[in-house]
């Protein structure tokens, strides 16, 4: 009797459901990644555009949550991990690609749809100048309410000039909706919201799927700058580092030469400038006691010269702090770590 009851129960299952479960089971087994997206508020007719974009990369299926659960169990997935996401109308994306990159596609890929009552404008909604193709009649009063200047020409309504009917953040006027539809204007952006990804046994909620590429890029650049600074300090022997190291060593050598008075063609200017500065300082100190017969620069001139010299030193320090440019960061990564 139990077998008969089971057989009768099995006969009641529609054949299309059995085929659907079989197909879903195979898709689950052959995919590295499964993403579940919400269809609430998303126009079902827009899925074909996503299918076209992902052709060859992913398979998109709209099916009942119960059928997916059965298929997932058949494929050996612990469905309890995904149970909380299997509510409401869902779409299932099967792919062999990385879940983060696949989610990035859905984050960035926006589709347009016609406005509905209560929709807010994300950008200016403009009724363009020109022939609307609409026959003159009651529609003229609607244009009037929207403060759109019109004229009738050959029995058709013509808009005199481009007119903004909603600014970003404004609710799109209800009166404008039929006009926008007739003109083929789709002012509302929609995107498929991914709830979760299942990747090789790992459940990844939507909030953990988002990649902060700018943050990663900034961190890598900062890490490279720090590594480059260290490499310059220890004179790490690669061409892109050594040109900075040699320049720094040369500057330090000139500074030391000017301090000890070591004269070479390269250090002559620094040594003489240092000596002149010391001589002026000494002369200024004793000028009140001894008549040197030499006109000394005023305190203001001396201060200006010192300020200029200090500014140049600060500029040099800033240049050293800045380190390599963005181009040098890009080209230097390979030579420093490769």
Swiss-Prot record:
Residues 309-325 have a biased composition (Basic and acidic residues). InterPro entries: Ribosomal_protein_uL10, Ribosomal_uL10, Ribosomal_uL10-like_insert, Ribosomal_uL10-like_insert_sf, Ribosomal_uL10-like_sf, Ribosomal_uL10_arc. Keywords: Ribonucleoprotein, Ribosomal protein, RNA-binding, rRNA-binding. Residues 297-338 are annotated as: Disordered. Residues 298-308 have a biased composition (Low complexity). GO terms for molecular function: large ribosomal subunit rRNA binding; structural constituent of ribosome. SUPFAM superfamilies: Ribosomal protein L10-like (SSF160369). One of its GO terms (cellular component) is cytosolic large ribosomal subunit. Belongs to the universal ribosomal protein uL10 family. This is Large ribosomal subunit protein uL10. It comes from Saccharolobus islandicus (strain M.14.25 / Kamchatka #1) (Sulfolobus islandicus). The gene is rpl10.
């Amino acid at each position: 009797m139990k077998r008969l009851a089971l057989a009768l129960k099995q006969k009641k299952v529609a054949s299309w459901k059995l085929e659907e479960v079989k197909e879903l089971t195979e898709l689950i087994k052959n995919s590295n990644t499964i993403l579940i997206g919400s269809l609430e508020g998303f126009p079902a007719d827009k899925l074909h555009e996503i299918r076209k974009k992902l052709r060859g990369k992913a398979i998109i299926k709209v099916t009942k949550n119960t059928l997916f659960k059965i298929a997932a169990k058949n494929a050996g997935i612990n469905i309890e991990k995904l149970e909380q996401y299997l509510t409401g109308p869902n779409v299932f994306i099967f792919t062999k690609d990385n879940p983060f990159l696949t989610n990035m596609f859905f984050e960035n890929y926006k589709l347009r749809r016609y406005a509905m009552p209560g929709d807010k404008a994300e950008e200016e909604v403009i009724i363009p100048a020109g022939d609307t193709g609409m026959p003159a009649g009651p529609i003229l009063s609607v244009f009037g309410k929207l403060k759109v200047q019109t004229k009738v020409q050959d029995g058709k309504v013509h808009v005199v000039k481009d007119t903004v009917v909603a600014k970003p953040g404004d609710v799109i006027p209800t009166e404008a909706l039929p006009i926008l539809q007739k003109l083929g204007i789709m002012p509302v952006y929609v995107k498929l919201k991914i709830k979760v990804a299942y990747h090789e046994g790992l459940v990844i909620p939507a909030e953990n799927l988002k990649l902060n590429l700018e943050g990663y890029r900034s961190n890598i650049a900062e890490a490279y700058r720090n590594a480059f600074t260290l490499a310059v300090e220890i004179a790490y022997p690669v061409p892109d580092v050594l040109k900075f190291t040699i320049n720094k060593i040369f500057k330090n050598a000139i500074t030391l030469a000017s301090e000890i008075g070591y004269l070479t063609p390269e250090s002559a200017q620094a040594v003489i400038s240092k000596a002149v500065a010391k001589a002026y300082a000494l002369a200024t100190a004793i000028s009140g006691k001894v008549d040197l017969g030499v006109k000394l620069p005023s305190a203001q001139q001396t201060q200006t010269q010192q300020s200029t010299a200090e500014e140049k030193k600060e500029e040099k320090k800033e240049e050293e702090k800045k380190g390599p440019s963005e181009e040098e960061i890009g080209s230097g990564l390979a030579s420093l770590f490769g």
